[in-house]
Amino acid sequence: SLTAGHCGFRDLREGPHKFTGPTGGKLLGAAPLRQIMVQEELKEVRVFAPATVANVACGYDVLGFAIESPGDEVVARHSLEPGLRIVQISGDDGKLPTEVSENTAGVAAQDLLRHLGMLDRGVELEIHKKMPFGSGLGSSAASAVAGAYAVNKLIGEPLTKKQLLPFAMAGESSADGAWHADNVGPCLLGGIVFIRSNQELDIAQLPGPENLWAAVVHPDIEILTKVAREILPREVPLENVTQQVGNLGGLLCGLIQEDYELISRSIHDVIAEPRRQKLIPEFYRAKRDAMAAGALGFSISGAGPSVFALCEGEETARRVGAEVSRVFSEAPIENQVYVSRINPHGVHVVD
């Protein structure tokens, strides 16, 4: 929800931006703040940041896409008390800290305010978690993106979405120490995002076929990201690297050319999936039945336990989602199914 009028629009040059790595929010190539015309500040803003599927099989740490739901909501409003405060968190069963420096949304928002020289600005945040923790759906990234985006909107939108990337990255990194944009990028920008360099935050949005759908299933089991990363090999045979690079290139070409057959031939992970699948009960059966139901490809979302299938058309995606859900239910493992187009918008303001 936007509460207030508006005046002039931003006059911010939208040329290519380069970012440093984990710098605490430095921007390179951005227009100086004195050159930026911002919209009038708002009294309150509510934003929604969507779940994301990272890695997309063959794009480990360099490829991700956004889905329509679930996601997190953050409300930002002005306060007479100086500084940033988190005044409410819901949907977390008391797990998340309200201390700004220990909360992903708080870190992202604070890093942004520090960059803008506004640390004394009074801002309150409400965080409403509406997606499962440790799901492999980018929960930490969604909160970080929502925190940075909401505060940027509240103070008149001095920065573009792409310029918010390092601040959201700092927020997510505060949760697990990792620095990879395959969740934050698509959550912030929407669509399918390819990361050429995580250190430089050199990213590109990719087009995709209009009728490309995702079926995402989250089984109610817990996989610690730390465990999922430690299980991966430190060294990879050259033959596997060649296969993976070929699959990634094929997937990117298939998306750009809207070639569903090439997409299907390319959604194969020969590095992470063979090791991580053992952490997900019934993974093999779920993949087999998803492919039999018409999926283009099937793999693990992020570090898991969520799994995803890319499909041509909504009908196929719903059929695949139902089949995968059945496999987990028979285990028996409670699960949730999310069937969605690729979300082209990313984080956005909601009523």
Regions found by a protein language model. Name each.
Residues L12-P16, T20-G21, K26, A30-L33:
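Short, low-complexity intrinsically disordered segments enriched in A/P/G/S/L with frequent Arg
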Residues M37-S135, K153, E157-L159, L189-G190, ...:
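ATP-binding N-lobe of GHMP and related small-molecule kinases
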Residues R77, C187-N198, A309-E312, V350-D351:
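Short beta-strand-to-turn element immediately C-terminal to the catalytic PLP-Schiff-base lysine
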Residues P82-R85, T225, E315-G321:
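Short, conserved charged micro-motifs
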Residues L119-D202:
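Gly/Ser-rich oxyanion-binding loop with an adjacent helix/lid
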Residues V216-K278:
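Active-site rim beta-loop-alpha module in soluble metabolic enzymes
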Residues L255-D351:
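Glycine-rich, charge-dense phosphate/pyrophosphate-binding loop(s)
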